[in-house]
Amino acid sequence: MWKNPNFFIHLPFKKTEDVNPIKASHREMNPNHLALAKQELSTLLSEGLIEPTTSPWACEAFYVNKHAEQVRGKLRLVIKYQDLSHFLAVDKFPLPNKSALFQHLSNAKVFSKFDLKAGFWQLGIHLEERYKAVFCIPDHHYQWTIMPFGRKNAPSQFQKAMVTLFQPLLTNALIYVDDILLFSKDEESHEKLLIEFYNLVKSHGIMLSEKKMVMDSLL
């Protein structure tokens, strides 16, 4: 889906403030972190998820030695977007209230739960906007082609895309960012709902996390 221009996101600046591009002067990385970053970014480059840039913007990327910042026991590259976020306009698309969502389930008996794999990465960034989604490590400067984690407005923009994409199913689907819950009154109607869901997933090239799927759970 990230290559579908119909779902490319924009990163508009505030109209009420002068925008001064900020280019981080990167502090030194220790040799182990730098080697790890180069390896990780080489993979992202080969997959087309980032690309070299000459943007006037640059946000510092670094590793944090905290358990909360680790992914499956491995260090996670963190990007400091605060300077860029200051200039970005707020996306006002509302995120649903989690407790209010469950009010729609009073008559539901059958459920299936899905989670999008690497959720935000499934949305591309408009070609003319990529120069804003930029980060650097020592001697390297890149821009994202997809929506990165941790960026301002990412949850709202992703919610908007998912609601638009799954609009035909919303009477029997709850969507909270990259989590989708399908619900039906009986197994027969749920089977039809799943067929519609998978057709949309396939037609838009959406990737689901198999590990987090919960299928045909009965109440």
List each language-model region with its residue ranges.
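Conserved catalytic palm subdomain of right-hand nucleotidyl-transferase polymerases, strongest
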Residues: 70-86, 101-122
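Mobile genetic element proteins and their domesticated derivatives, centered on retroelements
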Residues: 9-13, 44, 61, 80, ...
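Reverse-transcribing Pol proteins
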Residues: 1-93, 140, 173-179, 183-185, ...
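Catalytic palm active-site di-aspartate
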Residues: 115, 150, 170-185, 212-219
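Conserved pre-motif C helix in the palm subdomain of viral-like polymerases
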Residues: 35, 106-109, 120, 141-172
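Active-site palm subdomain of RNA-directed nucleic acid polymerases
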Residues: 49-52, 155-196, 201, 207
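A conserved non-catalytic segment of reverse transcriptases
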Residues: 89, 145, 205-219
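Cytochrome P450 core scaffold surrounding the K-helix E-X-X-R motif
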Residues: 85-92, 120-132
